[in-house]
């Protein structure tokens, strides 16, 4: 696709695959709104006061129908928005078209190359001569990463005149990042510094992105305040758990049509995502084996009736392998060589480095056969046996299906709206330093409360005597911050 920014009749910038899908996107968006009570409640509560009036928000988060409802919630509260996806395969093109036509600048399409992906990220951050965004909604931390790497390169350039060298790294994706920054230095050597100075803060959606933020906080390089949305209970214990329980089998069946019952499924990692995946596979009739480094998580898996072994113990016996760790080098090419014919290998953690895709792609004599988009069979020359890799090792639930359903994403995205409001409303108060924060318990409980009515729930209320007895306010919060749920 030619990397040229287009404009709507109203002058809004965009780059999507097919604007003719906008009507279809709008229909699905309207269906999703009914399933997203938290976001709709935010529009009702905050819309009249327009709290985001004057705010520029950049989003780097899967451009799905559910995200479209989030974007239109931000614009309904007064924000101006520019958006890109955080994954080359996760965009739903009809959702991107609907938003680009009706609501916000979007730069996203399904099946981007890495070069296109980072071009889209750069466009979403580009607000013209006035600098960058005021706020970032991030998923995985790529938008945050680009600004931090850009600032670092500009400081080196100012001191030494040295520009980034893309050949200094073996990572093909980071080579692209360095090339983008290098080109930017020639146009404006203070581009990313201007972004940093304007930025009020970022709210981060995922475990992987949160890890990056805490690493930067620890080494003193975090450039602006950050709110860790992932560790809100109404995100991690719902989106990560129940969302993956829903979307893993959906992606597997759409990609392969394989029968899960009777198969041996290996879930690498037993955190919230791994727990949801293991539950889905067990319910579908698979025999589930978990790999873990953490003895507490391992014991939890055992108490659920699952086996806990190493990958090496089961690599030649299992039928389905799912990585959920957020770490790298979980399934290596040497593991894949030992797998049975047509074993399915997929990732639902975050980045594609959980599975050794580079090692697979460069394995001598390996043959790649594309069955359909995001479903590839890789045949090893010495055995003539093949494995099926989904979504090129990236998020299979978004690459091979449509991700998590609207209701559970409403919980996550309501947290995002609240986090963005918190950062924006406190921008002049000094409340938030260059650190990582978590939303307070009363806001977590508010997000849950907004979703109960949709499911027909009625809460019991504490009496005054009961409240005094347990030292819990009648209106909450009901649990201390350290409570684990």
From Swiss-Prot:
Disruption phenotype: Embryo defective arrested at the globular stage. Null mutations are homozygous lethal. GO terms for cellular component: cytosol; plant-type vacuole; plasma membrane; plasmodesma; vacuole. It comes from the Eukaryota. Binds 1 NAD(+) per subunit. Its EC number is 3.13.2.1. GO terms for biological process: DNA methylation-dependent constitutive heterochromatin formation; embryo development ending in seed dormancy; one-carbon metabolic process; post-transcriptional gene silencing. Pfam families: AdoHcyase, AdoHcyase_NAD. One of its GO terms (molecular function) is copper ion binding. Belongs to the adenosylhomocysteinase family. Essential protein during embryogenesis. Adenosylhomocysteine is a competitive inhibitor of S-adenosyl-L-methionine-dependent methyl transferase reactions; therefore adenosylhomocysteinase may play a key role in the control of methylations via regulation of the intracellular concentration of adenosylhomocysteine. Required for DNA methylation-dependent gene silencing. This is Adenosylhomocysteinase 1. It comes from Arabidopsis thaliana (Mouse-ear cress).
